[in-house]
Amino acid sequence: MLRVYTQLERGNQWLKQYEGRSPIFACVLGFTETGLIPNVSTAGATPADRSLTALADAEFLFNGPQSQPTYPLPDLAQGVSPAMISWPIYTSQNFPFQLFNAGLRHSPPVPTVDLRGQAARCLSSGMALPLPIVELLFQQGLEWGETLAKQAADGYLILAECVVGGTSTAQGILTGLGFSVAGQVNSSHPVCNHQQKHQLVEAGLAQAGQQDWLAHPLALVAAVGDPMQVVVAGMMITASRTCGVMLAGGTQMLAVYALARQISQIFRLPWTPDNLLVGTTRWVVEDPSGDTVALANQVGEVPLVATQLSFATSRYPQLQIFEQGFVKEGVGAGGCAIAAHLYQGWQQNDILNAVEQTLEDYYRLRDPN
């Protein structure tokens, strides 16, 4: 049900250590105007849809299927929101759950911890966020990482994200940190929009001017990042000192890991790399139009683990389409599937049945006739 793709010894040791332990599930919401660019993401069929995706996902993650949500899940080009995977798992297994608002355009319709951030401009501007906001969000991340780690006790944290356009800002961070990532990142598209991402990143870094980004990683986030990245980086650093941390995502969380490592070096912040893992889905890792394993190896140190969950036998075409490379990941879907297996031994059919039941309830409530 699980496979370790990089750093095999460290990855298997982490999985063994946290087998049978209950995690705390935290999802950090953010927004970047990068997500409004035509065709940049499939997390919403139109830019108008994508401007509300994080709000709809947050509402679904908190409430599950409802007859009249404030923000209905947006119609996707293909497939369904990955919140359809995360919600039934964390609620069935009673993971404590917390939503964090790192920077959204609108107030979420459900309870969140407001970190006093703001939505980011498009990364191509080279001025995505004001530096003081980035510094504030990082400090908030450090403090909340400590708090969540205390609550986790001998368990671990699942740190997830919801940022439409977030793989593009991830490419911006990785490029600024000196990694050669062309062709390696993923997206919600079945075939990754590499050229579009590359042009956005090059424009953003050019607008920001020549800087020593390795010496100024927070300034790099201010230039081409998004508000989620620096929050999760802060959480990761402090939480890793005392408990396990699963960064739940693919490209975006590899970028967060690389960012956090650089920040910790520059600011001499102690952290514990052995307590960290990146957890995602097979759909991300096996995406032929990206190369997550090569990216993880290039970033180095952190184990990359993926659930082997498949929707090939689902009775719903909206789930089968995941096998063609649509959607792939988001809001901790892969991390929750990994945790479901670790904590209660859930197998393929357990997860598939839970997700299909959620989808059935969703459609029944949405269209009772």
Swiss-Prot record:
InterPro entries: Nict_dMeBzImd_PRibTrfase_arc, Nict_dMeBzImd_PRibTrfase_sf. GO terms for molecular function: nicotinate-nucleotide-dimethylbenzimidazole phosphoribosyltransferase activity. Transmembrane segments: none annotated. Belongs to the UPF0284 family. PANTHER family: PTHR38811, UPF0284 PROTEIN SLL1500. This is UPF0284 protein AM1_5137. It comes from Acaryochloris marina (strain MBIC 11017).
